[in-house]
Amino acid sequence: MMSYIKQPHYAVNGLTLAGTGMDLLHSAVGYPTTPRKQRRERTTFTRAQLDILESLFAKTRYPDIFMREEVALKINLPESRVQVWFKNRRAKCRQQQQQSTGQAKPRPAKKKTSPARETNSEASTNGQYSPPPPGTAVTPSSTAGATVSIWSPASISPIPDPLSIATTPCMQRSAGYPMTYSQAPAYTQSYGGSSSYFTGLDCGSYLSPMHPQLSAPGSTLSPIASSTMGSHLSQSPASLSAQGYGASSLGFTSVDCLDYKDQTASWKLNFNATDCLDYKDQSSWKFQVL
């Protein structure tokens, strides 16, 4: 069984290696481990040995090999023990000198100053994250409040927008265009006052305060449209004109307005601003400059 494990010598690059076979089974039985090196026992010096060593240390702190061997013979100890004793004695002497001269006192002082440095560094680090002054802290909240006041329907004043009311007669859609682009009153008010959608057209000058039917931006034109334009416009909201969609896509200028003189509610473009007609027998619906 062990014949194939213990292989004979073999040739490597034509060179025959002579020798006995190696046991490939690294068992603890076949290879006894070396015993662990025992720790050297602590040397205990007697009073007489210490007196001899101290007398030599008083002469010189660094004895040469001959002095150490001579002292080792006197105290009956190996020279290596004498050498170690001198090394320890020199270290003890240096420690005593440092304590006597006060060189060891600044070390605790340095340790005391290190927490102060850490405190200063922490203070500087915390200073970077100090809260802004009260005036600066209010700025984000005021900005958020301004954003809410623009886009939130609850914060919009219920007062009707003059621009959305005044542009209703001029910008109302006819039956040829389907009424599918209705918007909420809050959304139309947020865009109704923008002058970029109406290039030079000041429809606020044509506001007629004589009709209470247009007091709310979301009210319909059914009382007026039933008598003048037919029932096909009774479901169109008055705030449809303030979308910014019709004004920007049609490209109205300062002289553009829609005419409802025709009862079929057809679009008539490119005529003077003086051609904007009134409704309901020209008696109760008159445009006047405010």
Swiss-Prot record:
Cell location: Nucleus
Biased composition (Polar residues): 94-103, 116-129
One Pfam family, short name: TF_Otx
KW Isomerase (keyword) present: no
One GO biological process term: eye photoreceptor cell fate commitment
Region feature (Disordered): 93-144
GO cellular component: nucleus
Tissue expression: Initially expressed in the Spemann organizer region of early gastrula embryos. Expression then becomes localized to the anterior region; confined to the cement gland anlage at stages 19-25 and localized to the forebrain, optic vesicle and otocyst at stage 28.
Recorded GO MF terms: DNA-binding transcription factor activity, RNA polymerase II-specific; RNA polymerase II cis-regulatory region sequence-specific DNA binding
DNA-binding found in the keyword field: yes
Residue spans binding DNA: 38-97
Keywords: Developmental protein, Differentiation, DNA-binding, Homeobox, Nucleus, Transcription, Transcription regulation
Task of the protein: Transcription factor involved in anterior and eye development. Promotes the differentiation of both rod and cone photoreceptors cells in the retina. Together with other retinal homeobox proteins, acts as an effector of a cellular clock which, depending on cell cycle progression, establishes the generation of distinct retinal neuronal cell types. Acts synergistically with nrl to activate the rhodopsin promoter. Promotes the formation of anterior regions and represses the formation of posterior structures during development.
Protein's UniProt name: Homeobox protein otx5-A
Source species: Xenopus laevis
